[in-house]
């Protein structure tokens, strides 16, 4: 019988960074140990059935599209805990659902673990959300953090520092490995052109606009350079406008959304990976970690990352790549040119990045730490 209740808004079939993090940990918990309580999504039936068939994980869908710690939801969770003799609760994201911890303990939960991501950082900066983080910290046994940046934001609100433990998303270093993507390059008309690749949702914070704006300076030194943007999002129209403004239609290639299985090959199209992320809204919207930097390192590419939030935790500046100010076009273009002009440097940084990913970021490392927090 299951002993762990996972409560989360971030679950499939919808794709996303937090969803991948939660699912990666769930797949590495012993079979039959977990019941999932999550929000409603359309066309979820076959997805939920696969969890039951493959992992003996029962998925229960609430009627709402977004779970909040309302009295109704708390009653549903309490009933699940009592009916299934559940003793452990795992929150896929501490905010906001972790606020329910106090009431779940009354129902019989004896151990509660909550993950944090990027959004808890801005919660920690604004009252009454900062108060909620403090309350969650009081009630849970462990509150995870991604890296030094998220820890520094959370620490002032958590009286018992021993409750803070590091659990970050893992990398499947077998899946994300160096690959020969020449056929893919040929398909997209790139051939052997020096290529920068960026993967991520097309939004302001990810810095695709700055890559386009920095490209004319790159082209002064490397006239045939190409920029490949993988992903989709609301910023696409603005990015199209920048391509037209700088007359870069022959240099910028929009790939759109791709399947997870194809991602390593698309990353491998690049000679350099770049995502100069930047903070927004006076530091309230930041990069929590930037798992895609680590995926690119695992694929053997040197990485240029932005200095937003926790992104520097994912790039060893000067070793696996460079960390730049995501608003500094000169810094962005300078590091791109440096890497595209020096095959030996690219190879050395790429090899160090792959080694670092294997030694420090594999799923086996982080899932072991997480399972220990749940006492399994």
What is each PLM-predicted segment?
Residues 5-7, 144, 190-206, 212-216:
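Conserved donor-binding/catalytic core segment of Leloir-type glycosyltransferases
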Residues 91-97:
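Short His-centered aromatic/hydrophobic patch
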Residues 293, 298, 302-305, 315:
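Short hydrophobic beta-strand element within catalytic cores of glycosyltransferases
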Residues 316-318, 322-329, 338-344:
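Conserved acidic donor-binding segment of nucleotide-sugar-dependent glycosyltransferases
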Residues 237-262, 272:
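Nucleotide-activated donor-binding/catalytic signature segment of Leloir-type glycosyltransferases, i.e.
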Residues 251, 257, 268-286, 301:
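Acidic donor-binding loop of glycosyltransferase active sites
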Residues 177-190:
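A short helix/loop element that forms part of the nucleotide-sugar donor recognition site in Leloir-type
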Residues 149, 170:
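Carbohydrate-associated surface elements
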């Amino acid at each position: 019988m299951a002993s762990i209740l996972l409560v989360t808004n971030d679950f499939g079939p919808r794709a996303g960074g937090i969803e991948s993090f939660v699912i990666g940990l769930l797949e590495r918990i012993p079979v039959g140990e977990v019941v999932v309580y999550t929000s409603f999504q359309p066309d979820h039936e076959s997805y939920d059935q696969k969890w039951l068939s493959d992992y003996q994980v029962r998925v229960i869908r609430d009627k709402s599209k977004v779970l909040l710690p309302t009295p109704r939801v708390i009653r549903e969770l309490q009933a699940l805990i009592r009916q299934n003799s559940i003793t452990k609760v795992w929150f896929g994201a501490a905010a906001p659902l972790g606020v329910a911890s106090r009431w779940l303990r009354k129902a019989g939960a004896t151990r509660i673990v909550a993950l944090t991501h990027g959004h808890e950082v801005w919660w920690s900066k604004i009252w009454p959300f900062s108060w909620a983080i403090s309350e969650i910290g009081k009630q849970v046994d462990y509150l995870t953090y991604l890296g030094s940046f998220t820890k520094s934001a959370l620490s002032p609100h958590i009286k018992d520092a021993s409750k803070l433990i590091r659990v970050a998303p893992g990398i499947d270093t077998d899946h994300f490995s160096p690959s020969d993507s020449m056929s893919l390059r040929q398909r997209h008309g790139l051939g052997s052109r020096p290529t920068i690749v960026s993967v991520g949702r097309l939004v302001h914070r990810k810095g695709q606009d700055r890559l386009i704006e920095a490209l004319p300076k790159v082209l002064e030194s490397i006239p045939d350079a190409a920029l490949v943007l993988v992903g989709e999002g609301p910023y696409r129209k603005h990015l199209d406008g920048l391509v037209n403004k700088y007359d870069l239609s022959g240099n910028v290639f929009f790939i759109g959304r791709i399947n997870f299985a194809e991602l390593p090959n698309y990353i491998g199209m690049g000679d350099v990976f770049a995502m100069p992320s930047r903070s927004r809204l006076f530091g309230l919207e930041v990069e929590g970690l930037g798992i895609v930097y680590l995926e690119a390192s695992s694929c053997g590419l040197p990485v240029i990352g932005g200095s937003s939030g926790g992104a520097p935790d994912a790039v060893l500046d000067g070793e696996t790549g460079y960390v730049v100010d995501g608003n500094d076009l000169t810094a962005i273009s300078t590091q791109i040119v440096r890497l595209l002009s020096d095959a030996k440097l690219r190879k050395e940084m790429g090899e160090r990045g792959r080694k670092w990913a294997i030694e420090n970021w594999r799923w086996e490392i982080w899932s072991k730490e997480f399972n220990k927090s749940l006492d399994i």
